[in-house]
Design a protein with these regions (language model features):
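N-terminal pro-sequences and low-complexity stem/linker regions of secreted or lumenal proteins
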Residues: 2-20, 24-563
Length: 563
């Protein structure tokens, strides 16, 4: 390995030339260190998007003044892998609740375009690992639920009982090319065909209104029902979008250890979106999941599916250079140098931090098993750890990348301690530890829901609460289906609709905001509140969306009462 950071030569961000989980438990780090076109109502919602962008009767200058007066702290709680429908399908006041959607518009199609007669099995089973929840044992195998109708469904046991929110289901594929094929120009009829979990993608929690604390928070404050994930695909690239509104870039990837991950697109696909399928990949969704060849990097070398950071915590470390990953590994992304929201905040002298649950334990080599109830840690959920500005030993790393600790007590959770002490910076990003983030496969909805409630309760008791805005949202849909078509944008997104709840003394109360937002809207709000330089990726997204139908993604002010 060389000490020299590779040069990216990527100063002019150009998202337009082409058509458009791994997880790590703390024990793994220890080893490394030791070694829509939907129904007519939905279409009407799409057409009305431009009518709900501003969300306030105040002039722009009055909004700016009100933001400076009323908001001094922004807190972003970034959860994992749930579509809007999966948790909020029929929340009161939605523009287009699931229950009013014409059944013909949500019918799923096979990979050849024909409509499926039934849904396929849930490949490998809905609950493939035995677990005890509420004193009852759960193990739901592939053969236990079959022949489901081609329709969305409430998640249930084979006996027909509602699946408890505390049960960890199997994971679902959530990746850049898959998501675009699933959305299928807004028809959202390819989720089964291009997923890897069979029928499971169409599931949602039918008892959410009675069981989820997040529903109660949304009832009290503002739920956004047109909030879309910033990028098609998975956690890695959507965490990157949260901090810089663009994917990472790997220069000369074709000459690098990562060259095997460069996508080869199928020349027979007229849209240029489908990677080549492996030999023997099932022809029909009823026979099994589609299997792609490598699809980590785009043909022009943007990293769109999971790569690991150049610095610890990482899966594979450089034994000769403590704190650094092995840069010869094909999964390691070279250090990035383009601007992030952290850079522009620092340039303006605005305090900020990324708090990560389990960060300190991961760096120290703590070890726990890989399942819910244990503090798993995901290296690709730490976006600033991919940038040379935050390399080990730098002042910026020490100041801005903070250990949130673990659990739900101020004794062990350092973010909770800072909240109670009124010591939060102006902008706080919080990434919960893995078993509390709601990610299917290793976390459950109930644990994450409880954790959100604990954090919100603490924030409301903080001395900083009076001038605070909290955004609770998800990185991406986790592969779960949604019926609302994302607005047309640039080659990166927006992707599938996800939940977002705005919590603040200045949020509209008991409100559903129909404004069009994406993950970048969080950056737009921060940029507007502190008068920052707007990141190039935000500008590119706005130009692309406006060129389609005049829609501009909002900046969250539609959720606020600033009068």
């Amino acid at each position: 390995m060389t000490d020299k950071t590779p040069t990216q030569n990527d100063t002019s961000f150009n998202p337009s030339p082409l058509n458009p989980d791994r997880r790590l438990v703390l024990g793994g780090i220890a080893a490394a260190i030791g070694a829509a076109s939907v129904d007519s109502s939905a279409q009407a919602a799409t057409h009305s998007r431009r009518d709900v962008l501003k969300g306030t009767a105040l002039s722009d200058s009055a909004v700016d003044a009100a933001l400076r007066e009323k908001i001094e702290n922004v807190v972003v709680i970034f959860c994992e892998n749930r579509s809007f429908n999966n948790l909020f399908a029929d929340f009161p006041g939605l523009q287009v609740p699931l229950s009013v959607v014409d059944p013909e518009t949500y019918k799923q199609r096979d990979r050849d375009g024909t409509q499926l007669k039934t849904l396929p099995p849930i490949w490998n089973g809905m609950v493939p690992e035995k677990q005890v929840v509420e004193h009852k044992e759960y193990l739901i195998a592939q053969g236990d639920i079959t022949g489901l109708a081609n329709a969305p469904f409430a998640l249930k046991t084979p006996q027909g009982d509602p699946l408890p929110h505390g049960v960890v289901t199997r994971d679902l594929v959530h990746a850049f090319y898959n998501n675009q094929l699933q959305i299928n120009d807004g028809k959202n009829d390819g989720f089964v065909a291009w997923g890897d979990s069979g029928a499971l993608v169409m599931g949602h929690y039918g008892e959410a209104s009675a069981k989820l604390r997040l529903w109660n928070i949304a009832r009290e404050f503002t739920l956004c029902d047109n909030f879309f994930m910033g990028v098609f695909g998975g956690s890695f690239v959507n965490h990157q979008y949260l901090i810089c509104a663009r994917p990472p870039f790997y220069p000369e990837a074709d000459k690098s250890p990562a060259k095997g991950g460069i996508t080869k697109l199928d020349p027979s696909d007229p849209k240029g979106l489908r990677p080549l399928l492996r030999e023997g990949s099932p022809a029909s969704a009823m026979e099994g999941p589609a299997k792609f060849t490598s699809n980590v990097l785009t043909p022009d070398f943007y990293a769109v599916n999971t790569m690991t950071p150049p610095y610890a915590p990482a899966y594979k470390l450089d034994p000769a250079k403590p704190g650094y990953a092995d840069w010869t590994s094909p999964s390691t992304l070279i250090p990035q140098t383009h601007k992030t929201i952290g850079d522009v905040l620092s340039d303006k002298g605005v305090s900020w931090a990324w708090y990560s649950g389990g960060w300190g334990t991961a760096l120290a080599g703590g070890s726990t098993p890989d399942f819910a109830g244990h503090a798993s840690f995901q290296v690709h959920h730490q976006p600033f750890n991919y940038y040379s500005r935050f390399a080990p030993g730098t002042a910026d790393r020490a100041e801005h990348l903070r250990d949130a600790g673990e659990g739900e007590s101020p004794r062990t959770n350092k973010l909770l301690a800072d909240i109670a002490a009124g010591k939060l910076p102006a902008v706080t990003f919080y990434k919960p530890q893995g078993n509390l983030n709601m990610h299917a496969g290793y976390s459950d909805v109930e644990a994450g829901d409880q954790h959100i409630a604990v954090m919100v309760d603490a924030l409301r008791r903080s001395p900083q609460w009076g001038k605070m805005l909290v955004v609770i949202t998800f990185d991406e849909n986790g592969g779960w289906w949604d019926h609302i078509a994302p607005p047309k944008g640039d080659r990166w997104g927006p992707g599938t609709r996800i939940p977002a709840v705005i919590v603040s003394p200045h949020a509209k109360k008991g409100h559903v905001d129909h404004s069009v937002y994406d993950t970048g809207s969080i950056l737009r709000f921060i940029t507007r509140r502190w008068g920052l330089e707007k990141l190039p990726g935000l500008i590119e997204r706005e130009k692309a969306m406006q060129a389609v139908d005049g829609t501009l993604p909002g900046d969250l002010t539609g959720a606020l009462d600033l009068a």
